[in-house]
Amino acid sequence: MATVNNRLSIEQVRAIVEHNDRVEIDEATRRSIIECFHFLEAFSKDKVIYGINTGFGPMAQWRIDDEHLNELQYNIIRSHSTGAGEPLPTICVRAAMLARLMTFMQAHSGVNIATCELLVEFLNRGIYPVIPQHGSVGASGDLVQLAHIALALIGEGEVFYNGERRNTAEVMQELGIEPLKMFIREGLAVTNGTAVMTGIGFVNLFHAKRLLDWSTKASVLMNEIASSYDDFMSETLNGLKLHKGQNAIAEAMRELASGSKMLLNREAELYRRSEESTFEHKVQPYYSLRCIPQILGPVWDAVASAESVLLNEINSADDNPIVDPKNQTVIHGGNFHGDYVSYEMDKLKIAITKLTMLTERQMNYLLHDRINGILPPFVNLGVLGLNYGMQAPAFTATSTTAECQTLSNPMYVHSIPNNNDNQDIVSMGTNSALLCQRVVENSYQVMAIHMITLVQAVDCLKIADRLAPATRALYDAIRAIVPTFVVDTPKYKEIAAVIEFLKK
């Protein structure tokens, strides 16, 4: 059980989103939310406040009569439930609901506590509104996608429950849950913010961390297979560059390589008198083997930056207007604008694309016998010409990497004015997060094929017993899923199984 106040750590977000930890609201935070609601209730009676007694967006110039104020809140929910495309994965919906709840935990939205309690109920019971992927321009927040969450909260639309897509009203009646009622601005408060892009962003972040970890391990195993000199990962060399990510990757590689009998010591091998005029072993390996700290270092930095920004976003008030009980006022502005998340998702997808490109190049090294000089073509353990080894899986890896490269074009600078130019510059943050999600999924596919290629190479060279304990554990884990193969068999199911292993 996670007790939620107005701040979440990355560990808490992961526990709630990935491990389905239950949620309860901290009592002090509960009191603050109730106090904020009562302040707004009194403050708003004789004032013009956007979205309470005015229309929305460019329609804000029209005042709404008192008898229609409740109807207004339902109208924004129903009118904006217009998404299209496939539904978001339920893990992303769970993360989005948590992000919306956290905005209300800041006690600056003026919502009735019932709104927060119902979001908690949905999270704890695993009720996930059906949210189509497309609809957000990310700049009055995720209006369309969040409207689908609000639609479920008022007992309409559809939800996923126990793996089934069902009518919301039926599920709520079955569980004895009352639909949300509108009090002052609940409709606007639920729909107006960055929760969906932030939720998808966190799911992307967790997977990006895993991919970086797998890439680092695979890179050590790559260098063991190639019997590389180990000085490229030395503390002295990497310490001469001040980038935190580069040094973190180099340190991780040194730890993973500890105990290896395959890596060479340059001083022992080359820094002694030699009469050779031509060297059989490469003095310096290819960049995809030697420059790993410099390539994965920026990926590490991008992941760290995304984590910092996403934590700031989920622990912020991204509503509009903002209710300020302390100063006895209501402030109008643009905290719903998703530029921070949009920019980070663009950076993260570029970083994961580069990681994927590194993976594909490392795999190419293993497949290309004239480059590696130690393995048969395509790591083919069968009869050359009759059997094909990893030749065909490489097509999948190459085409998928190419798609990542195209998807890496930034959304952040693709603003299109809309909403009758009321929203004349927008973030496209949810689109950026969705594209990042696609890149992450692609990267797992390439990584899975690379992992199978790596263990085939280890078996070809018969070096499993000479690997470092960490890379031997990786070898054993992949071999438990994909046994050594010589003859040609369909590999799509094994690739899928390795992907699932990598994700966990």
Question: What kind of region is each of these model predictions?
Answer:
Residues 2-21, 25-32, 36-39, 69, ...:
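C-terminal auxiliary extensions adjacent to catalytic cores
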Residues 2-46, 71, 76-132, 223, ...:
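Glycine-rich, flexible loop motifs
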Residues 44-48, 126-129, 146, 167, ...:
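Hydrophobic alpha-helical context, especially transmembrane and signal-peptide helices
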Residues 50-64, 68-72, 79-102, 132-154, ...:
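FAD-binding core of FAD-dependent oxidoreductases
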Residues 79, 95, 99-103, 118-129, ...:
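Mid-sequence acidic-hydrophobic segments that form the walls
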Residues 105-128, 135-146, 151, 163-184:
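Well-ordered mid-protein domain cores that form the structural environment of catalytic cofactors
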Residues 131-136, 326, 330:
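Cysteine-centered functional microenvironments
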